[in-house]
Amino acid sequence: MLPKNLKPFHIKNENLIRIGPKLDGGYVLDKRTIPLTEKIITCGLNDDWEFEKHFLKIKPNCEIIAYDHTVDRQFWIDRFKKDIVHFFLLKKLRLRKIISIFKYYDYNNFFKSGNKHHQLKISNKNIENKEITLNKILHDYDNLILKIDIEGDEYNILKQILDNSKKINFEQKITEKNYPINGLDYKNSHRKNDFILNFQD
């Protein structure tokens, strides 16, 4: 059972808009919140910021702040090597896929123009230059969209999301629920029940 402040509610179709790609990485939002949004906090970046780029076309003065400890220099080196191999194996023949080989240049351009990417892991504790909590990230922010896609760790920070929902004016919360849940023992029913009860009202 979802807590009340995470349950979806009915919105008329004419108030909905899809932002980002048609496939993975795109999300349907209530378009009435777009003019009110001052910042997008993105937790989990990987190599996809199409949602953020599309949003900025609609509201150019919105600030983008991303957190992902996995996207570093080695990430781009490994990605480029893999893409080059695929290219020579004739797996990247479409123009879109060929352009994606040079995604690093798009990353540099996007995060040089006032948008920020912090190489920090979203966690339940603050460790300088390594890990950061949502509580610390959201401390000084309001009127924002919180976008979370951290591959199974979303549940580990769900309590922080709930706590901040009571204090901060979120225009919208976007969370991808990935399975398996990191750190959860599926064979132990007591742990599963404890996990679920932890987030019920």
Predicted features and spans:
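N-terminal accessory regions of S-adenosyl-L-methionine
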Residues: M1-P21
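Generic detector of short, locally flexible boundary/turn motifs and exposed helical patches
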Residues: L2-F9, Y27-T33, L138-N143
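SAM cofactor-binding core of SAM-dependent methyltransferases
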Residues: E14-E128, Y141, Y179-I181
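Conserved acidic-Pro-Pro-aromatic motif
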Residues: K39-I41, K57-I65, R73, D78, ...
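A Trp-anchored, charged/polar loop motif used as the substrate-binding/catalytic surface
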Residues: E128-K136
